[in-house]
Amino acid sequence: MILVVLIKRGQQFKGGESMINVNEFNYDIVKRAFNHAKTIRTNKKITYYEIVTSFDIETTSAVQKGQKFAFMYIWQFAFENVIVYGRTWEEYQHFISKLVEILQLNEHKRLIVYVHNLGYEFQFMRKYFEWSENGVFAVDTREPIKALTTTGIEYKDSYILAGLNLDHVAKNLQHHKIQKLVGNLDYTQIRTYKTHLTDEELAYCANDVKIVVAYIHEQIEEYGDITKIPLTNTGRVRRYTRQQVYFNGQKQHRKTGGQYEKYRKLMDTLTLSPFEYEQLKRAFQGGFTHANANKQGKVIDNVTSYDFTSSYPTVMVTEQFPMGRGFHPKIKNRKDFNFYRGHYCLVFDIKFTNLFPKIKQEHYLSSSKCKCSNDMVEDNGRIFSASMVETTITNVDFEIIERAYEWDKAEVSNVIAYRKEYLPKNLIKAIIHLYKNKTKLKGVPEKRPEYMRSKGMLNSMYGMSVTNIVHEENNYLNDDWTTSEPNLKKEIVKYNHSKTRFLFYPWGVFVTAYARRNLWTGIISAGNDYCYSDTDSIKIENGEKHLPYIKKYNQVVKNKVKDVCKKYELDIEDFEPFTIKGKQKPIGYWDSEGVYDKFKTLGAKRYLVFQNGKLMLTCAGLSKSKGVDYLLKVSNNNIDKAFQIFNDEMTVPSQYTGKLTHTYIDEPVKALVTDIDGNKVEVNPLSGIHLAPTEFTLSISKIYNQFLLALIHGELLIKDVQK
């Protein structure tokens, strides 16, 4: 609902809305609004008001005598189109207590309040309220995404729901036109509750809660009511997928022809043992991201970039995955091993003796996932050679390792084998539906929100398949964060018997393995022309020379798509949709991103390119836009000089990084500060987060530097260099 309220008192600011000081607020507005508000009772016997509210604060960070502290100087609370603000926590406590009194809230009758990045606000306000036992749900220490007070105020995080910052949330609103205001608050200035705020500054404060209110209204339109909105973005995807696989996407579950029973029967066969789960966790790896050490630090002209069209979704719809319970096959020799790895999905422990590379351009094994001898030679986190390497892998990983290394001896143990089949038909259809929507909606301005939703959900399909079954619990109790170790056996039993589960953890382990294998076909084919790779993309020299490989690979994908379509009687056109401009985008193909005029890499997630007159930077820990701005500034827009400056000694001053250091303050602080108006004010925050701009230094590790020097001086041996 949208409240239409005539407000006679309150401060008007640009845009025509009213922002009411809490000390002038007429609480009759609340009574009138909530008297007509809809309430919803859930199956857990909890009643919620369906009124959209949002809360936000602005803070100041300061340092005195080496002590860091931070404090709030304005809060704003929106319920529908009414925005109330105050300047102190005492005012906010009083405001909330009045809401609780008027609405008769308690732990069984609640009001949901959305906060964009709840973890930040929670650190400032947590000691001002009493929290319900087990009422704070966190994904990590200091990262609550839901927090319930004993008086029935239920804070939820809209950031983890949207997966976007407020600027992008505003841009993707479908029915509301609100822009995130920028540039109106200088966060380096000291402001307190006594600091005068201009109309523009108040507009900035109000705008953030307005965006959240508009966003939540659109979520209600999508899901039906406020209690049905998922807690997280992944929850959104889970709900969509569960509906597709169990009920064919239909709301009338009785009309699904027994689909629920069929899928439930499959899930009952897909169970794990604690030992099996731990072995699978050891075998799991993410995307492969690395640079060819032979190209490191060099400025290379005419580098072609190729990327896969939806890499993870592709393998999910074209490859075969573990089905049924795992078993321990009897493997007596290499012949047995080759049979099982050709006909089953395998996970196993392996020990290599005297491991050496047999290709120059790249090394596959991650040192962080292996136990190695002291003589290991490391290539920026990847194993070049070692006299002993122990690790846990899949049979798909072994395919890559065979092509990248040689060894004197390999000992395999603890082999778990799974019958392999395509993923269930309805799951594949759900993935392809999202891919088709993403492709058709891309580049259509009025459909941007729907495009972003389909794209985000498609990208989350893989992520939810590898969510840890067993993880630490993060608890907030007595003003403190604690973690508790889970009971492995108990959690695995719970997982196996879950009646809502629709995924199998081993599927996710093999999704990334297949994707790495696909990427490595390009790395190996490119040979010495290979420069860099990142999960689903590859940068190579002499791009035209490698077109035969690209075409051959794409044909392999096309054949795999044909096979799965034949198996499940699916329409191949859904796998090859057209964009708005009439370009066909088959899923899984290598697609050219064009040619870089200049390219330079300093290692994983560190590269600079110049293309079509534009400088572009990817550097972990540094804002892309801020980093480019700095390089252009110090190079005086000289591109060649910018590439020279981008090296392992580059330091970006704090004012150019866009990077903030977060320091958590858990103890009360009393300090006398002078604000920008000259007011001397005593502040006494109970807790908070101090934010400070920080510089960025691009440095190469000592171990990697030693490897590069040895490589340059020809001190590293490659056992059998590829022809």
Task: Give names to the regions the model predicted.
Residues I20-V113, F124-I145, T271-V299, F308, ...:
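Conserved RNase H-like, two-metal-ion catalytic cores of nucleic-acid enzymes
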Residues F55, K156, K298-Y312, S454-L458:
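Conserved catalytic palm subdomain of right-hand nucleotidyl-transferase polymerases, strongest
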Residues N81-L197, A203-N207, I211:
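Conserved DEDDh/DEDDy metal-dependent 3′-5′ exonuclease domain
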Residues H168-Q259, L519:
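Acidic, Mg2+-coordinating catalytic module of metal-dependent nucleases/exonucleases
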Residues I220-Q296, G324-F327, L355-C531, I540-K723:
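C-terminal, non-catalytic extensions of nucleic-acid polymerases
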